[in-house]
A protein has these predicted regions:
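Short active-site neighborhood of thiol/selenol oxidoreductases, capturing the structured segment around
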Residues: 65-95, 111
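Short loop/turn microsegments at loop-to-beta-strand junctions
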Residues: 52-53, 75, 172-174
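Coil residues (strongly favoring Ser/Thr
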Residues: 46-47, 64, 105, 121
Length: 212
């Protein structure tokens, strides 16, 4: 099994506050940097937050998927592999609750990256999706180059480890909530039903949040 560990030291960049309509605002997670620029002749400092980089993958239908396909969407990401005998089935069962809650909602996606692309071919991913009852384009199972996926995982504040000396894969599963600007807004234990309920509630909060 492959180890997925949410990186220690996630930086909380935005304290929870309130909208004018008294709705909770989710924090922005990850690194940030200050950028100085001139606007209307005035020097101002802006904050640039960590975002998910450009991607290029293939989904379970054989369609090419890149970051442009996620533009303007709130989405949840996770990492898995189809032969995982332990927590992946629990994660995917819990992700089905998220899928069923939002499958008819516009502006929402789920992206699940396989960390074993050698085994998880497109036909394998399609059979896996069919077994889960996934249809349509709300939830994509994505296959790409392993090294690229490992780098992408880091951008989600998740680390991926290779096989251990015994030849086994080990992984912890987390669901990562991304906003329309591709910023990280929450991390959730995908094996914990209470955490998944919180994720569903936070998606609703994020959908109500104005894009600034």
């Amino acid at each position: 099994m492959k180890k997925l560990v949410v990186a220690i030291g996630i930086v909380l960049l935005w304290n929870a506050c309130k909208f004018n309509n008294n709705e909770k605002v989710l924090p922005i997670l990850g690194s940030r940097r200050a950028v100085t620029k001139v606007v209307n002749g005035q020097t101002v400092t802006d904050t640039v937050y960590q975002t998910i980089p450009a991607i290029k993958y293939i989904n379970q239908y054989g369609d090419s998927i890149n970051d442009k396909n996620l533009d303007g969407n709130i989405y949840v990401a996770d990492f898995f592999f189809t032969t995982c005998p332990s927590i992946c089935p629990i994660m995917q069962r819990n992700m089905l609750n998220v899928y069923n809650a939002f499958k008819d909602s516009t502006g929402f996606k789920i992206v699940s990256y396989t960390i074993d692309p050698q085994h998880d071919s497109i036909p394998v991913l399609k059979r896996y999706a069919d077994k889960l009852g996934i249809n349509g384009n709300t939830w994509w199972l994505l296959q790409g180059h392993k090294d690229e996926t490992y780098q992408v995982a880091k951008s989600y504040l998740v680390s991926v480890q290779e096989k251990n000396p015994a030849g086994e894969y080990i992984h912890d599963g987390y669901f990562i909530l991304i906003d329309k600007k591709k910023r990280i807004r929450g991390t959730y234990d995908g094996t914990n039903p209470d955490e998944v309920k919180k994720l569903i509630a936070d998606i609703k909060i994020l959908k109500a949040e104005p894009v600034i």
